[in-house]
């Protein structure tokens, strides 16, 4: 019964703020999980800034993002180099005041490196207000596993894990700040290679898990992950079903 009540209250809040017009951009602080198809783009809208946690996907709601963020300082946090997490940089408006607060680890293709080089590094990243860890380096490989190099960030109770696989989860999920997470953005869009039992055991205070994915084409979130989340009695929301998800 407690789970049902928690889900109902949270659903009401989501419906309320999902209907909030973007013209009220100065009314409150909130976070938006954008419906970008298969990919990830989450924006924390604040009084004088927008913080973007990955900027990738199959499509981008540029008009809505512009309404909220074009007149503010934009901080970009990139978990790793995969295109469905960084692709928005290719069309990023040059007129916006923007900097990279967290670049991906290591190097990538010449094209991606050149694209990232267009942006200045942030001088003020407000590190005390967000936490990150760098997964163990994988040694000298010709083709490193970029998913395993995903950087993990918690901001305002929301846990962003990039495409971090189960093996890497076992390393960073023991950090002391992980259990305080209230919202989990599913790793690797809900792939069966992420969101382990160990991680869910470590995040018992979760109010909701969110899948930024497209099941119709990619079968994410995977049925095994959905079942795992259900066993832990964590409500699961999907951008494919809800559209943009607003969190206050």
Where are these regions (language model features)?
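Core dinuclear metal-dependent hydrolase active-site scaffold
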Residues: 2-75, 118-186, 241-248
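Solvent-exposed loop/turn segments at secondary-structure junctions
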Residues: 38, 57-60, 81-85, 106-108, ...
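Binuclear metal-ion centers of metallo-dependent hydrolases, dominated by the metallo-beta-lactamase
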Residues: 97-149, 172, 208, 213-248
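Catalytic cores of nucleophile-dependent amide-cleaving enzymes
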Residues: 181-199, 205-209, 213-218
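Receiver (REC) domain switch-region micro-motif
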Residues: 73-76, 99-101, 184, 209
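Short, conserved loop/helix-junction motifs that constitute active-site signature segments
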Residues: 69-71, 92-96, 176-180, 199-206, ...
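Di-metal (Zn2+ and/or Mg2+/Mn2+) metal-binding site signature of metallo-dependent hydrolases
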Residues: 71-96, 105-106, 188-198
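Short amphipathic alpha-helical segments
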Residues: 64-66, 88-91, 113, 172-174, ...
